[in-house]
């Protein structure tokens, strides 16, 4: 039933937009990428797919959404809809990191109290740092501030994402590595085991790269 439902939802959505869509099930990520690669990016199709509360539909939506018509307010609506970290991660990877306003959104979302906004904010920041984006002095201070606060917060998902973003920042340069290690020093002695171990893990990776 699940597979049939997915197949019919997607094929109907694609048919309405004039795309012939045949789906064989067993939908792993590489297969979804293959499916998406066969089609032109299409705003209406992507929006229709996103509205379906089905994992594969949401993953495909991120792959088929054109950047040009994906306005900041739609980005917020999508994040509001997210319920699974996998969807957050894949949408950041296939769509969010390519948005012209990606950096602004990363900062806005990192500072948001809502779990999935923070999660996407740090995941997006990690992606941008991996692409070699350099932070200005002011944005660097804001990022480090936000990441350190999140590392010590209760939210497990944002905490892990903040740790990943800190690692990506730290490995960009020796100078960045030193800054991060200085900030982490007190946390490695934290009474909270999970915080101390996350801090230790970031420190270890930073030292490995430098």
Region roles according to the model:
Residues 1-210:
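Alpha-helical scaffold domains
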């Amino acid at each position: 039933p699940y597979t049939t439902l997915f197949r019919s939802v997607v094929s109907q959505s694609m048919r309405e937009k004039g795309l012939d869509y045949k789906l064989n099930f067993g939908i792993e990520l590489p297969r979804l990428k293959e499916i998406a690669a066969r089609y032109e990016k299409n705003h209406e199709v992507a929006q229709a797919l996103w509205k379906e509360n089905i994992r594969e539909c949401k993953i495909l939506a991120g792959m088929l959404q054109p950047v040009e018509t994906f306005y900041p307010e739609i980005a917020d609506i999508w994040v509001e809809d997210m319920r699974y970290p996998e969807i957050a991660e894949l949408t950041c990877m296939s769509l969010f990191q390519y948005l012209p306003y990606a950096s602004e959104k990363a900062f806005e979302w990192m500072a948001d109290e809502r779990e999935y906004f923070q999660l996407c904010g740090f995941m997006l920041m990690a992606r941008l740092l991996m692409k070699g984006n350099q932070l200005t002095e002011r944005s660097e201070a804001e990022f480090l501030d936000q990441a350190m606060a999140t590392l010590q917060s209760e939210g497990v998902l944002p905490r892990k994402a903040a740790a990943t973003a800190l690692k990506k920042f730290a490995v960009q340069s020796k100078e960045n590595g030193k800054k991060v290690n200085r900030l982490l020093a007190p946390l490695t002695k934290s009474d909270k085991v999970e915080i101390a171990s996350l801090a230790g893990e970031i420190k270890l990776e930073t030292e490995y790269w430098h």
